Amino acid sequence: AQARLLNRLASEKKQQAVIHIKYDTGFHRIGFPDCPESLDEIRQICSMPWLKPEGIYSHLALKDDQSNQVQFRCFMDAVNELESEGCHFRYKHIADSIAAVDFPEYRLDMIRAGAIVYGLKGFHKGQLDIRQALTFKTRISHITPVLKGQGVSYDYLWTAPQDTRVAALPFGYADGYPRNLRGKAMVTLRGKQVPVIGVICMDQCMIDLTDVPEAQIGDQVIIYGDGSGNTLDIDAVSRLAGTNKNEIVARLTRRPPRIYVRGNDSGTGYSSAERMTP
């Protein structure tokens, strides 16, 4: 039904629609199920005059090597049968970031690089020298003295064990920082790890400055980085949050400004731009 509708719309615009056909080999999310009837439907799509099936693809569940091989073989059997009957595809693709590294034979004509673009390593077998390309930074926006026994943030779930100073950082869960990191996460300030304290708010969170008494408003704080310079990397943050690396990155909302860099003289890849988040 979707193909017929798209064919009609393309006909009305007198412009051929370029499409990729999803073939479900066992992930059971979307796509044509693996059966003869599906191959018949795909043949019909290939014959529609205003559709150009440029590619065909599937997605691996990545359960284990054996199930990956079953899915790959299923995909290639379907593709080979279709191409033997005149359905030709410029691109055949089944490999995401993990499969592209761990199983080079699955790369075919195209790979769908996702997490690997950010330097996130999800692969286990393959070797690829990459470095995390994402650093999440902010700056101290406010510092307030807190006396021993006084509470911080909602419900006073953190109380000061001694007289100290508390810094507010202008980011929170509305920026994509997991709220369940309360009492677990550390951020990096002046080369030292300092704890995130109290309940993480929508637009702000707080850190304890006990170990960095010299901290000042405007100081840069690294929320997470590539693991160098005493920073937490995304792996560590995801473990603390009880999730995976991809979700931590995907949580980032549009509010934090993105600064794209090619690297600098120090080789860190950090931006020299002075901007606050959000």
Regions flagged by a language model, labelled:
Residues 4, 8-18, 24-147, 213:
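Active-site loop/helix belt of alpha/beta enzymes
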Residues 145-278:
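C-terminal accessory subdomain/extension
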